[in-house]
UniProtKB/Swiss-Prot annotation:
Keywords: Cell inner membrane, Cell membrane, Heme biosynthesis, Membrane, Transferase, Transmembrane, Transmembrane helix. It comes from Polynucleobacter necessarius subsp. necessarius (strain STIR1). This is Protoheme IX farnesyltransferase. Converts heme B (protoheme IX) to heme O by substitution of the vinyl group on carbon 2 of heme B porphyrin ring with a hydroxyethyl farnesyl side group. GO terms for molecular function: protoheme IX farnesyltransferase activity. It catalyses: heme b + (2E,6E)-farnesyl diphosphate + H2O = Fe(II)-heme o + diphosphate. Disulfide bonds: none annotated. Its EC number is 2.5.1.141. The keyword Secreted does not apply. GO terms for cellular component: plasma membrane. Belongs to the UbiA prenyltransferase family. Protoheme IX farnesyltransferase subfamily. Gene3D superfamilies: UbiA prenyltransferase. It is a multi-pass membrane protein.
Length: 297
């Protein structure tokens, strides 16, 4: 069920209150990208302890980061229709309990990553936690409309975390994957911010559609999508993938571009929502194409 369909008047079971604080759908996408990074880092099978340890450890630390995000944005979330149902915003889960919950998740995640993967992965994941929960959420998001660009690195790190879990290094190939997510994030998020701009006006957060208007935001979405399409060529150019990935990346990129150009020409909230949803499908299929090309072709 989407955020917009939730209601602050509905009392969730206690376990689910904590579960939603981890933003499970976003966490799933992050872990998926981390797993792709693991498999792309080796020509063979990822060792099972590393695979499962990496999945669980990264999931736990990501969940902890999102819980801290909910805590910091408690007052902001309460003002927004999309997020007012969250247990942190309604007060069903107290700040102290969120802090304890985040410490438990984060500590377990660090222990698992240290023991099943390697210290590098643990420290990188912890740095990503700090980058998202503190630098982005606390410092950048309320300060600048370029928050999602400047703070986007933390959200783009999962493939590098997966790569490091397997190789105990960070090669150029890992950073190619990070770059793809980094330049994907602005058009993905700004599509959401456009059709939720009234929410962001209420929140007081300086999101680009609020501070610079619809047309400027749409232009930036188009520009970043073009940069994204160029960035997705890097895995092929540098020999990480073959023709199957290249063709998939071109087709998916043109589809994404068609959405954003249509949005630029004739904006509607409904089309912005479709563009936002397709952006998630786009990233999932793009990374799946990398995996298929790597192992099966």
């Amino acid at each position: 069920m989407s955020d917009s369909k939730k209601s602050a008047t509905v009392v969730m079971p206690r376990w689910r209150q904590y579960w939603v604080l981890t933003k499970p759908r976003v966490t799933q996408l992050a872990v998926f990208c981390a797993v792709i990074g693991m498999f792309l880092a080796t020509p063979g099978m990822v060792p099972y302890p590393v695979l499962f340890g990496g999945i669980v450890g990264i999931w736990l630390l990501a969940g902890a980061a999102f819980a801290v995000n909910c805590l910091i944005e408690q007052a902001v979330d309460a003002k927004m229709k999309r997020t007012s149902w969250r247990p942190s915003a309604t007060g069903e889960v107290t700040p102290l309990h969120i802090i304890i919950f985040s410490i438990i998740l984060g500590s377990l995640g660090m222990i698992i990553l240290w023991n099943f993967c390697n210290p590098l992965t643990m420290w990188l994941t912890l740095a990503t936690f700090v980058g998202y929960a503190v630098i982005y959420t606390w410092l950048l998001k309320p300060a600048t409309p370029q928050n999602i660009v400047i703070g986007g690195l933390s959200g783009a790190m999962p493939p590098a975390l997966g790569w490091a879990a397997v190789t105990n290094t960070l090669s150029a190939e890992a950073w190619h994957l990070v770059l793809i997510i980094f330049v994907w994030t602005p058009p993905h998020f700004w599509a959401l911010a456009l059709y939720r701009r009234d929410d962001y006006v209420q929140s007081g957060l300086p999101m680009l559609p609020v501070t610079h208007g619809e047309r400027f935001t749409l232009l930036n979405i188009v520009l970043y999508t073009l940069i994204l399409i160029a960035a997705t060529m890097l895995p092929y150019i540098y020999g990480m993938s073959g023709m199957v990935y290249l063709i998939s990346a071109i087709i998916l990129g043109l589809l994404f571009l068609a959405y954003v150009v249509a949005l630029f020409i004739s904006y509607s909230d409904a089309l912005a929502k479709k563009t936002f949803r397709f952006s998630i499908t786009y990233l999932s299929l793009l990374f799946a194409a990398l995996l298929v090309d790597h192992y099966f072709l």
